[in-house]
Every structure is written in structure tokens, then in C-alpha cells.
């Protein structure tokens, strides 16, 4: 039985290593059947948080409920119901794909049909292949198969597409979307904003051990940044002296002063003023466009870093 319709409920979670507090009292819930993304720069505490939920690391304080179990004391009962796909899965070079599946299946009290699983993950023609002969994308599909061999209710995906080329990453995205259609609960950590926007129903942004935003990608964008972004390009550099109205807005200017990016809650008015200023300065406007802030913009605004830093 899960907690109030949540597959995962975390309350007041803390984890310390000596005097260093890696996780500083976080609270969140993951609903049954949703894909929940955990985003954060390196060292933010997301890996520690996930490992605590998986039962791989003890917590210092707080409570964690995963599918009705406390992973700190009931990990053996929990392991039959979760699947874990790590960022890097290394198997013996001479192990065949079907041998890896048979080995992992032996760890659990319940299994799926392995032949059907291989077919679903487009590995049926690789069942007798040595692990060392597989491509990077095929190895990642094997890692997914190993995480699914016990037909888990909850799947942990730790940066499942890191290091893969764009085409292979797209193939993995499609597989995850198929898993999502099963109404299986998935917790995803990723270093790719576009991956979170495409796959996640909701996301939490964690930084310095604390959750600083949570909601759907659109909710976070609208709640955190209510300003549009105006981007302007001129044939030559903009004047050294900026107008008064620009000083009241948040803006960035390229080193050669040809590219200007302005955040404004009144974009129509700001565009009129910007174009008027450029015209009065005798400059040639070569490009102008307006965009809403992306999840990447929000992430940078909240953490001061890009996700892959």
C-alpha cells in the first residue's frame, strides 16, 4: 500500500557526512504513475537523495516511504518492487545478453518473460551477443532490461542517456515514453533540460541540498520567471551609454556589444523602446525575436549554473 496515492513520500530528509550536510531537510512526493524528474547541478545532493530512496545509503534524519516501505529498514522487501538503471552498467565482456538477464532474474522472486522483454527493448536479435560487442545505445538498453526484469512498480533511471549521441538518446526517450504508457512510476535524474521537458510530468530542482522549485515544467517556468526574453542583434556595437529604461530591466550584452538580451514583464512596450533607441542611435537592427523563458532559463536563474556544469 502506498502513502496517500504517492509511490514515494519524503519528509524532512537529511544526510550528513561529518560536518557536511549533503541533503538539508527536503520534502516531496512522487505520485503513482508519473514520471518525476530530479534536476540539479553536480554536488547538489540529488544522487544522495536517490540512493537513500533505493535503500543503498542510510539517512541521517527524516522519513522516506517508497511503495509503503521504509528503504532504510525494509530494503529486502522493497527490492522486488523497484528497478534501478544506473548511469553506467558494467558487465563482464564475455557475458551474453541473455545470460545477464538470467543472472539478474535470479535475484528476484518474480520475473517477466525475458524473451518478450528483449523484443520490447529491440534486443531480441542480440540475445546471444557478447556484452563487449554491443554499441553504447545497445548497452543502455540492456541496462534498462536488467532494471525491468522483475516488472517493477517503480523505476529509478539515473541519467540514462548521458554520453549517448543524439539519435540514440532519442531512441531511449521513446522507450521511456513506452514505459510511461504502462502507468509505471518513474523517477528520472538527468543532465539534459530537454529530456526533463519531454519526459517528466513534474520536476524538482535541487541545489545545495535543498529543493528550490517543484511542479510541472510549465508551472515552474511561469511561477519563477514571469518575464519574456527579448533578443536583439545589430550590425555594429550598441552605444556605450545605455538609456534609462534599460537600466530598470535585467539585461546582458555581448562583448562586442552587438547582441542584447533583455528580460521584461512588458515585452511589447520594451520592444518599442528598444527599436526607438537603436533607430535614434543610427544603428542597423539585423535581428529581433521574443521568447518565453525555458526550463533551462529558470534553472540558471535559480542556481546560477547550467545543468551540465
Language-model features: locations:
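ABC transporter nucleotide-binding domains
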Residues: 5-10, 15-208, 213
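Preference for bulky hydrophobic residues occupying beta-strand positions
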Residues: 15, 28, 121, 231-234, ...
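A generic structural signal for secondary-structure junctions
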Residues: 83, 109, 122, 222-226, ...
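ABC transporter nucleotide-binding domain
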Residues: 173-265
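C-terminal coupling/interaction segments
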Residues: 267-309
Amino acid at each position: 500500500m502506498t502513502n496517500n496515492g504517492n509511490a514515494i513520500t519524503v519528509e524532512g530528509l537529511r544526510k550528513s557526512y561529518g560536518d557536511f550536510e549533503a541533503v538539508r531537510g527536503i520534502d516531496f512526493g512522487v505520485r503513482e504513475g508519473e514520471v518525476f524528474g530530479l534536476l540539479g547541478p553536480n554536488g547538489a545532493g540529488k544522487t544522495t537523495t536517490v540512493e537513500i530512496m533505493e535503500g543503498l545509503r542510510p539517512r541521517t534524519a527524516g522519513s522516506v516511504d517508497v511503495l509503503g516501505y521504509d528503504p532504510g529498514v525494509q530494503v529486502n522487501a522493497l527490492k522486488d518492487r523497484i528497478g534501478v538503471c544506473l548511469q553506467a552498467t558494467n558487465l563482464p565482456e564475455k557475458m551474453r545478453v541473455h545470460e545477464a538477464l538470467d543472472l539478474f532474474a535470479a535475484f528476484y522472486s518474480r520475473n517477466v518473460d525475458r524473451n518478450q522483454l528483449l523484443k520490447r527493448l529491440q534486443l531480441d536479435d542480440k540475445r546471444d551477443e557478447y556484452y563487449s560487442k554491443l554499441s553504447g545505445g545497445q548497452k543502455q538498453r540492456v541496462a534498462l532490461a536488467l532494471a525491468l526484469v522483475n516488472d517493477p512498480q517503480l523505476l529509478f533511471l539515473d541519467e540514462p542517456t548521458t554520453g549517448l549521441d543524439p539519435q540514440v538518446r532519442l531512441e531511449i526517450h521513446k522507450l521511456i515514453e513506452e514505459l510511461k504508457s504502462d502507468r509505471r512510476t518513474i523517477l528520472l535524474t538527468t543532465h539534459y533540460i530537454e529530456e526533463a521537458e519531454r519526459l517528466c510530468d513534474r520536476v524538482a530542482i535541487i541545489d545545495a541540498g535543498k529543493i528550490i522549485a517543484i511542479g510541472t515544467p510549465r508551472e515552474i517556468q511561469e511561477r519563477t520567471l514571469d518575464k519574456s526574453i527579448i533578443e536583439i542583434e545589430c550590425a555594429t556595437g550598441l552605444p556605450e551609454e545605455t538609456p534609462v529604461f534599460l537600466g530598470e530591466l535585467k539585461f546582458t550584452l555581448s562583448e562586442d556589444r552587438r547582441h542584447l538580451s533583455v528580460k521584461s514583464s512588458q515585452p511589447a512596450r520594451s520592444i518599442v523602446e528598444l527599436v526607438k533607441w537603436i533607430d535614434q542611435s543610427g544603428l542597423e537592427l539585423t535581428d529581433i525575436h521574443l521568447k518565453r523563458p525555458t526550463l533551462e532559463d529558470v534553472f540558471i536563474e535559480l542556481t546560477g549554473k547550467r545543468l551540465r556544469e
